């Protein structure tokens, strides 16, 4: 009985680890999709501001 419980606990622990790893991967991919758009816009605005200040 003890060995069954240990195996069960190990399986649950392994499932949790895999689940957390999948959630982390999903969060990373969502963040990667969301933030480059903002960064590109920021870069565009920044280069526009720099070119305006050079022209003045």
Swiss-Prot record:
Signal peptide stretch: none
Superkingdom of source: Bacteria
GO BP terms: regulation of DNA-templated transcription
Keyword vocabulary terms for this entry: Toxin-antitoxin system
InterPro entries tied to this protein: Arc_rbn_hlx_hlx, MazE
Disulphide connectivity of cysteines: none
Protein's job: Antitoxin component of a type II toxin-antitoxin (TA) system. Labile antitoxin that binds to cognate MazF toxin and counteracts its endoribonuclease activity.
Family: Belongs to the MazE/EndoAI family.
Quaternary structure, from the entry: Forms a complex with cognate toxin MazF which inhibits the endoribonuclease activity of MazF.
Protein name: Antitoxin MazE
């Amino acid at each position: 009985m003890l060995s069954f419980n240990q195996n069960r606990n190990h399986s649950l622990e392994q499932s949790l680890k895999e689940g957390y790893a999948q959630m982390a991967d999903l969060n990373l991919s969502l963040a990667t999709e969301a933030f480059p758009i903002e960064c590109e816009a920021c870069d565009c605005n920044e280069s526009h501001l720099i070119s305006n200040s050079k022209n003045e």
